Amino acid sequence: MSVIKMTDLDLAGKRVLIRADLNVPVKEGKVTSDARIRASLPTIEAALKQGAKVMVTSHLGRPTEGEYNEEFSLLPVVNYLKEKLSSPVRLAKDYLDGVEIAAGELVVLENVRFNKGEKKDDEALSKKYAALCDVYVMDAFGTAHRAQASTHGVGKFAPIACAGPLLSAELEALGKALGNPARPMVAIVGGSKVSTKLTVLGALSKIADKLIVGGGIANTFVAAQGHNVGKSLYEADLIPEAKRLLETCDIPVPTDVRVATEFSETAAATLKPANEIKDDEQILDLGDESAERLAEILKNAKTILWNGPVGVFEFPNFRKGTEIVARAIAESEAFSIAGGGDTLAAIDLFGIADQISYISTGGGAFLEFVEGKKLPAVVMLEERAKQ
């Protein structure tokens, strides 16, 4: 995967436009979770340090395209950056016809989704973005799977288009886990539905030595073995697909589970064998025996790809399976990469972030990469590197 890297360029005096992922939750004008901004800070600081004229932009939320809406303004992000950076920081609302900017200054360009044509990758808008800069830096892996004007179109017309440090690290980590992984390679796919992760399961079944399934996905596999799953969330129409995967890949299906008679935080958990589930019960977590078996597999792994919890970890009574698996990943000497919103929430809950080799910032982009799909932004950067 050969792309031009921002770290290889001399940015002194250049107008640099960074497309970051600053799509953070905001409440009453304040940023409530700063993880994505924190991840982008080293890229911004590196460009400023070189004496570049730095512009950074992002989307935030889902405003009506082409209309300004204060609720989705990047102003709270600007206020946050002012506290963290020693350089001057300001917000530019009307910037499509040009921005006056000094070396060592940071200008945040207002929410790209306020511009008509952003989502449709409009060529005229892409050219306006491109005219603002000498160097375009794509650093938002989380939106690399969408061909939009600020993530894709602009890169086709900017004098130079390169990958930022975050995007480069993300592609390297995914390449290491999927391209030529150290073996045994173990993949974990959790989540509620097989249907939404079908292509991911299919792709990983060809790469992984063992494929661990969790959550509602695992219930479909339990059902595929002929067991009653009661009121559990599962997909009867995908049982043939589950059976096919069981034949082609090593999938350790749970042998014991935690069940409840209702889906609620206060529901009592009952531990039982997977072949003894009653009609009024639903599986909400792995049993201890199954979780410990997975922990053993993970401890011996050399590469781990983790996407999704193995139970309803948001409910304390059904957290144990995910915790055992999470701690086994943290303690394993394997190269581990984790991605997806629920997975990141579990990592935070158990406080193991510094024990995971690489935590992916992209949800949909992470999954599409795992599926083997080409990400439009990455394809564009590869094409520009050839020119």
Swiss-Prot record:
GO MF term list: ADP binding; ATP binding; phosphoglycerate kinase activity
Binding residues annotated for ATP, in chain numbering: K197, E314, G340, G341, D342, T343
Annotated keywords: ATP-binding, Cytoplasm, Glycolysis, Kinase, Nucleotide-binding, Transferase
Compartments reported by the entry: Cytoplasm
HAMAP family, per the entry: Phosphoglyc_kinase (MF_00145)
Lineage: superkingdom: Bacteria
Complexes and interactors: Monomer.
Binding locations of substrate: D21, L22, N23, R36, H59, L60, G61, R62, R113, R146
Biochemical pathway: Carbohydrate degradation; glycolysis; pyruvate from D-glyceraldehyde 3-phosphate: step 2/5
GO biological process per UniProt: gluconeogenesis; glycolytic process
Gene Ontology CC terms: cytosol
Top-rank EC class of the record's enzyme: transferase
Source species: Yersinia pestis
Family: Belongs to the phosphoglycerate kinase family.
Entry EC no(s): 2.7.2.3
Catalytic reaction list: (2R)-3-phosphoglycerate + ATP = (2R)-3-phospho-glyceroyl phosphate + ADP
Name this polypeptide is given: Phosphoglycerate kinase
